[in-house]
């Protein structure tokens, strides 16, 4: 692995690792966050399409790319709602675990991954380890009823949001276009969902006139940077799909730690140790699910 490939492979660490923290730092409600983030992603995607002349898909390729982006928009709205309940440092490991679980199960039952009994035993064991790791990251010494209730609500929300993230990753598999070509219509699908959600919240306030909404465009740049560098990293002449995926998953570590330290989402020393162990379990088990394909 060259230095250039490694640096590109760690791009998602920066983009996706800082995205939830930046979005939370700017504040606002989920409606402000999703509109700003998706507009930022769309701006990034338009510039990228112009610079690379990547073309624009049509027909079913366009439809599935739009559906993919719409799925992400739905999933991210739900995730932002979970941030309100438990903070990004607790929500991110859980949503990452659910996404790994969903992608792996889809790969096994729809795409024929993990052939043979031995691979399936290893794979499903790894999924159990991922869930154990996620549970460890949200463990708390304080057994307050309100905290437990908020955590349960957040987990349910994130489980629902996984359907959107699953669509985000699964829909492009029905197309004949590469990730770079799909990026712009995906961003359009994200914005469509965000705008619809914005209009659904118009009775409370007009989110399109709130300055926080447009400040959140910066958070969208972080997400888009992570997505772009992942697409490049996954190319065979760079890191390849398996290594690129594993490098991208390190973003959950940065997202969790920046949430704790930058957003002051306090954890005790014991909670920190257990959280770190949980994150390591998630990363190691995620690596296993990739290499047994």
Swiss-Prot record:
Topology within the bilayer: Multi-pass membrane protein
Q: Which is an annotated GO molecular function term of this record?
A: carbohydrate transmembrane transporter activity
Give the residue spans that cross the bilayer: 5-24, 34-51, 58-80, 95-114, 121-138, 153-170, 177-199, 212-234, 241-263, 273-292
Pfam families attached to this UniProt entry: Sugar_transport
Which controlled-vocabulary keywords does the entry list?
Cell membrane, Membrane, Sugar transport, Transmembrane, Transmembrane helix, Transport
Reply yes or no: does the keyword Transferase apply: no
GO CC terms:
plasma membrane
The subcellular location is: Cell membrane
Q: What InterPro entries does the record point to?
A: Sugar_transport (IPR010651)
The Swiss-Prot or TrEMBL record describes its family as follows:
Belongs to the GRP transporter (TC 2.A.7.5) family.
Query: Which function does this protein serve?
Result: Could be involved in the uptake of ribose.
PANTHER family from the UniProt entry: TRANSMEMBRANE PROTEIN 144
**Name the UniProt record assigns to this protein:** Putative ribose uptake protein RbsU
- Taxonomic lineage of the native organism: Bacteria, Bacillati, Bacillota, Bacilli, Bacillales
Q: Which gene encodes it?
A: rbsU
């Amino acid at each position: 692995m060259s230095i250039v490939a490694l640096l590109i492979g760690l791009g998602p660490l920066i983009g996706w690792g800082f995205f939830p923290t930046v979005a939370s730092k700017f504040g606002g409600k989920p409606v402000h966050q999703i509109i700003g983030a998706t507009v930022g992603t769309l701006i990034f995607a338009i510039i990228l399409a112009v610079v690379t002349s990547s073309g624009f898909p049509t027909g079913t390729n366009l439809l599935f790319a739009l559906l993919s982006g719409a799925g992400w928009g739905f999933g991210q709205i739900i995730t932002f709602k979970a941030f309100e309940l438990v903070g990004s440092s607790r929500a991110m490991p859980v949503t990452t675990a659910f996404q790994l679980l969903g992608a792996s199960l889809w790969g096994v039952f729809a795409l024929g991954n993990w052939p043979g009994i031995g691979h399936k035993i290893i794979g499903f064991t790894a999924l159990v380890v991922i869930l154990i790791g996620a549970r460890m990251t949200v463990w708390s010494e304080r057994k307050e009823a309100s905290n437990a209730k908020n955590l349960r609500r957040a987990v349910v929300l994130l489980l629902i949001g996984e359907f959107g993230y699953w669509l985000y990753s699964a829909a492009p598999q029905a197309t004949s276009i590469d990730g770079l070509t799909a990026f712009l219509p995906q961003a359009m699908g994200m914005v469509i969902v965000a705008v619809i959600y914005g209009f659904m919240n118009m009775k409370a306030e007009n989110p399109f006139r709130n300055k926080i909404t447009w400040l959140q465009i910066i958070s969208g740049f972080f997400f888009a940077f992570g997505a772009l560098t992942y697409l490049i990293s996954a190319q065979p002449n760079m890191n390849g799909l398996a290594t690129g995926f594993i490098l991208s998953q390190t973003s959950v570590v940065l997202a969790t730690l920046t949430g704790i330290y930058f957003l002051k989402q306090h954890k005790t020393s014991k909670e920190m140790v257990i959280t770190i162990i949980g994150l390591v379990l998630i990363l190691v088990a995620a690596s296993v699910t990739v290499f047994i394909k």
